[in-house]
């Protein structure tokens, strides 16, 4: 061996290095990284002042660090020339010295090398195919090529002056820390799935691809990143990317994330809906942040953070996706109508807009099945029960292949069941509702949608009638050719309306101008009436066979609104009955609205949440109801800019314990994609007794016919003192006095519509609602 004299003495050591080897403890015998302080820590075992080959080859762990544990080591190494003689060393620690170069290529057994906190500008580790751990942080290296280090698992090279770092194809590499250098690029090509930890912060890196890896920690702060994608980081726990140029950041797939700091970027959108509440979250100093997508459970906390950052115009919701963040399971429910009452099969009818409840033993959620007959719930782990809730449950029998489900974990599992709804007896029941598709403006066209549905068990055929005041409204067209068209009226014959089926007809009328005769002006009321009847049979629920709509004429309007179709004032006799609401929305922006969400927080003290039904919508809608929050999701609606419109028609019962002068209100927030929500009007309806003392009702009063054309007959078992006529707004229109038990009221001067008659007799009063045709 070169440099070996008699007795195999090694002679090529740097003098300072030899001094350390001979006079100080440098040997670690128990593999704790610290030189032993007793005689076993001395390499010169025979104490002859020399290092023999046998002594060098006996060493497995060599500790030369300044803080090696020896109380006497005060000498700082400037060279380790001769280090190649330690051919069996697997662990070398020479940190915190003044080495400017280090060549350990002749130490083939080396597995761990710690040479941080020196002044290295050169490091040769070529050929070290057993090296697993390398730390040369806090040096002056400008480049490093790790090619060939095929077993390397950990590389620490932070706080150098690196402009080039080659780590490609290190298939065993698990952790890389190269922060605080001068890198402009970092190529991770060829690293494998074992790569878990990366710290490359405080560089000038402009692009970084970590998509192939499932990291547990990622620190890339203080770089020049404008894009960073994290589609596969399901085990990422710590993530810091502050002080970059990121405009959007999506950690939706990071379902184990505990720490996220993305402060001081150029973010306009942030997606943190991942099913977990981060322990530490920061996104300050992103003044252009307009949208944050979060889990519902995090909504309040993230909103508070945004407020503290001064982000008053930042929309925060969960509507970047319509499945839960993180892990979840899915229950699919198919609903079919057994028209022949012989068991559901492939020939039976898939139903839509059937209310479905999900119960986990404590809480209940609701959805309505879609057009293909399917409904779905997203769940965590646990036991769940799914139940169809029909408007008329006594009409039908319901059976299911299964309605209870168990999931051991929220891990992407799914289960499917089928519900079969069959007739329970013979029931004839249809309904009609009129929906304004536009406002009524003087001189412009107005569109009205007639929505009719078979709620019974039998196929229905019959007639749908539509009437209006032809003095102020002119018929223009209808989406379905009428069977009869007369002045102020149109009718359509319908056949084979299936149970649960809904159909619509749109009718267009033109409103008189302010200069026409008679004139129509802002604030006028237009009265329109729709009625439906089944041929040859009696409808079991005639109250919903007629719908009167009183529309106020306007000159201007808000296209995003909620309207109660029954009006702003109703008699107390309507308490506990259905109210119909239409929510209109319009895309007034400059780009397509891909998704639209209507969020309605319903007052449970005023409304019966269990009665809510979806009747009709302008496009396919996914409904979910949790507690008193109803969300109507129009996914992929692609609503065109500059006037693309949509709507949903609902009905819900008011609580039966409401009294005179109580009000019910509805409003909604409308979310167009990632924009700040638009808040609609607060639509308020007041229940009023129209001055009647309900403790003094005269139940003998009878009013007929109803509906009425011109004259209405009124009778009672007591003398009728007066009859007062009120319109739907509660205004007194007409008074008739008398003293007999029978009287005739002439309504020929009143327009078509709904009126209230307050009839006062010797024994009390009564209010009756009538419809004038």
Give, region by region, the residue ranges found by the protein language model.
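Residue-level detector of functionally pivotal "anchor" positions at catalytic/ligand-binding pockets or at interdomain
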Residues: 320-332, 347, 422-442, 557-561, ...
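Short beta-strand elements of extracellular/lumenal beta-sandwich folds
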Residues: 434-459, 572-601, 669
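A short, solvent-exposed beta-strand micro-motif common in secreted/extracellular proteins
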Residues: 281-283, 373, 381-395
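Low-complexity, intrinsically disordered segments enriched in Ser/Thr together with acidic residues
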Residues: 494-522, 633-661
């Amino acid at each position: 061996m070169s440099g070996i004299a008699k007795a195999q003495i090694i002679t090529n050591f740097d003098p300072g290095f030899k001094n350390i080897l001979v006079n100080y403890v440098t040997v670690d015998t128990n593999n704790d990284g610290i030189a032993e302080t007793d005689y076993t820590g001395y390499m010169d075992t025979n104490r002859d002042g020399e290092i023999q080959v046998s002594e060098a080859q006996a060493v497995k762990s060599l500790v030369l660090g300044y803080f090696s544990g020896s109380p006497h080591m005060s000498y700082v190494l400037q060279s380790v020339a001769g280090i190649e003689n330690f051919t069996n060393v697997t662990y070398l620690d020479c940190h915190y010295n003044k080495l400017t170069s280090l060549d350990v290529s002749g130490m083939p057994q080396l597995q761990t090398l710690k040479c941080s906190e020196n002044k290295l500008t050169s490091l040769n580790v070529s050929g070290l195919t057993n090296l697993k751990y390398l730390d040369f942080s806090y040096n002056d290296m400008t480049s490093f090529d790790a090619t060939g280090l095929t077993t390397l698992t950990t590389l620490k090279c932070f706080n150098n002056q690196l402009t080039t770092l080659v780590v490609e194809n290190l298939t065993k590499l698990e952790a890389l820390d190269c922060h605080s250098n001068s890198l402009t690029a970092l190529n991770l090509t060829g690293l494998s799935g074992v790569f878990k930890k990366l710290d490359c912060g405080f560089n000038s890196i402009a692009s970084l691809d970590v998509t192939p890896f499932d990291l547990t920690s990622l620190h890339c702060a203080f770089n020049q990143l404008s894009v960073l994608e994290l589609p596969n980081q399901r085990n990422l726990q710590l993530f810091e990317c502050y002080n970059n140029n990121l405009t959007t950041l999506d950690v939706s797939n990071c379902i184990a994330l505990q720490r996220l700091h993305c402060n001081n970027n150029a973010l306009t959108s942030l997606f943190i809906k991942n099913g977990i509440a981060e322990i530490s979250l920061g996104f300050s100093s992103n003044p252009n942040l307009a949208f944050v997508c979060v889990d519902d459970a995090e909504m309040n906390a993230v909103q508070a953070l945004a407020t503290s950052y001064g982000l008053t115009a930042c929309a925060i919701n969960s509507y970047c996706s319509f499945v839960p963040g993180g892990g979840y399971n899915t229950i699919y429910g198919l609903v079919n109508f057994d028209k022949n009452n012989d068991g559901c099969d492939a020939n039976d009818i898939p139903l839509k807009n059937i209310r479905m409840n999900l119960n986990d033993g404590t809480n209940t959620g609701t959805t309505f099945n879609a057009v293909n007959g399917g409904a779905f719930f997203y769940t965590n782990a646990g036991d769940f029960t799914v139940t169809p809730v029909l408007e008329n449950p006594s009409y039908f029998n319901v059976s299911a292949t299964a309605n209870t489900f168990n999931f051991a974990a929220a891990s992407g599992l799914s289960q499917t069941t089928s519900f079969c709804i069959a007739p329970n007896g013979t029931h004839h029941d249809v309904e009609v509702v009129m929906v304004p598709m536009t406002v009524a403006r003087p001189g412009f066209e107005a569109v009205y949608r007639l929505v009719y549905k078979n709620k019974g068990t039998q196929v229905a055929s019959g007639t749908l009638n539509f009437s209006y005041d032809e003095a102020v409204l002119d018929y223009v067209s209808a989406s379905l050719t009428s069977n009869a068209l007369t002045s102020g009226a149109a009718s359509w014959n319908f056949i084979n309306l299936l149970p649960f089926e809904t159909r619509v007809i749109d009718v267009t009328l033109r409103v008189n101008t302010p200069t026409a005769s008679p004139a129509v002006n802002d604030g006028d009321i237009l009265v329109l009436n729709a009625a439906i009847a089944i041929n040859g049979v009696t409808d079991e629920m005639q109250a919903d066979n007629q719908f009167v709509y009183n529309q106020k004429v306007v000159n201007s309007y808000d296209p995003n609104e909620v309207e109660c179709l029954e009006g702003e004032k109703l008699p107390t006799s309507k308490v506990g009955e259905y109210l119909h609401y239409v929510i209109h929305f319009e895309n007034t922006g400059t780009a397509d609205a891909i998704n639209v969400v209507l969020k309605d927080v319903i007052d449970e003290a005023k409304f019966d949440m269990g009665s809510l039904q979806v009747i009709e919508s302008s496009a396919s809608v996914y409904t979910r109801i949790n507690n008193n929050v109803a969300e109507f999701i129009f996914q992929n609606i692609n609503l065109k800019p500059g006037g693309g419109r949509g709507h949903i028609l609902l009905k819900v019962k008011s609580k039966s314990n409401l009294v005179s002068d109580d009000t019910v209100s509805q409003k909604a927030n409308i979310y167009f994609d990632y924009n700040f929500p638009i808040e609609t009007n607060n639509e308020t309806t007041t229940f009023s007794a129209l001055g009647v003392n309900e403790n003094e009702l005269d139940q003998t009063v009878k009013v007929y016919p109803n509906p009425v054309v011109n004259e209405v007959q009124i009778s009672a078992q007591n003398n009728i003192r007066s009859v007062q006529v009120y319109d739907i707004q509660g205004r007194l229109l007409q008074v008739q006095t008398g003293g007999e038990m029978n009287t005739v009221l002439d309504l020929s001067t009143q327009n078509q519509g709904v009126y209230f008659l307050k009839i006062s007799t010797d024994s009390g009063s009564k209010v009756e609602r009538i419809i004038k045709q």
